[in-house]
Amino acid sequence: MINMDKKLVLFDRDGVLNEAGRITRPEELRLLSNALRGIARLTQAGIRVGICTNQGGIAHGVLDEITLARIHDKLRLVAGEFGGHIDRIVHCASADSDHPLRKPNPGMLLDQARHFGLTDLSGVPFVGDNLVDVQAAQAAGAVPVLVRTGHGKNTAYKHRAALRDVLSYPNVETAVNHWLKEAA
């Protein structure tokens, strides 16, 4: 169950906040307006926003830390233009599936919990579009949420048995509107 009292929502980036696909330059960032409106609503409600994103392209040499920082600067800038604020972005640069920070492992989510002063992530939604996002949320004790943007529709269909009990929404804005209405 979602608990807005913890004042934190965590998101995957690719396919959730922007169109799916590998991004190697700020110009390639195609943000989803529904996601930006959802982030703005969270900001206006006093809820912090964190992002946890696998960025194995760094390990593969198709992206570097400086360019990734520029991509995230653009993400923050555009979110701000919509009235939203992204409090913290963490990423895993490793392509090693055993790396503790790389989803489906819970490391990035647990790091966000520590940063925001939470002893656990119970009730905190982690919104993603892939099975690894759901698995990371479950491993971290967060509430897994699947949005049907990016790879979400395919993930929902392909893994429907495993995702039977996972909250699912068409997009970020719809999810946020639902949670804020429930919390009112």
List each language-model region with its residue ranges.
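Active-site neighborhood of HAD-like aspartate-dependent phosphohydrolases
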Residues: I2-G50
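Active-site loop signature of alpha/beta-hydrolase-fold enzymes
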Residues: V16-N18, I58, D133, G152
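Asp-based, Mg2+/Mn2+-dependent phosphohydrolase catalytic module
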Residues: I2-V9, E65-R88, D96-F126, N130-A184
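A short alpha-helix capping/helix-coil boundary motif
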Residues: V16-E19, N54-G56, D87-R88, Q112-R114
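Residues that scaffold the ATP/ADP-binding catalytic core of kinase and kinase-like folds
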Residues: N18-A20, G61, H178
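Short, solvent-exposed loop/turn segments at secondary-structure boundaries
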Residues: I23, E27-R30, G61-I66, P100-K103
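Substrate-recognition element of Asp-dependent hydrolases with the DxDx(T/V) motif
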Residues: A35, I39-H72, H85-D98, A137
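Short, small-residue-rich loop/turn micro-motifs
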Residues: R13-L17, A93, R148
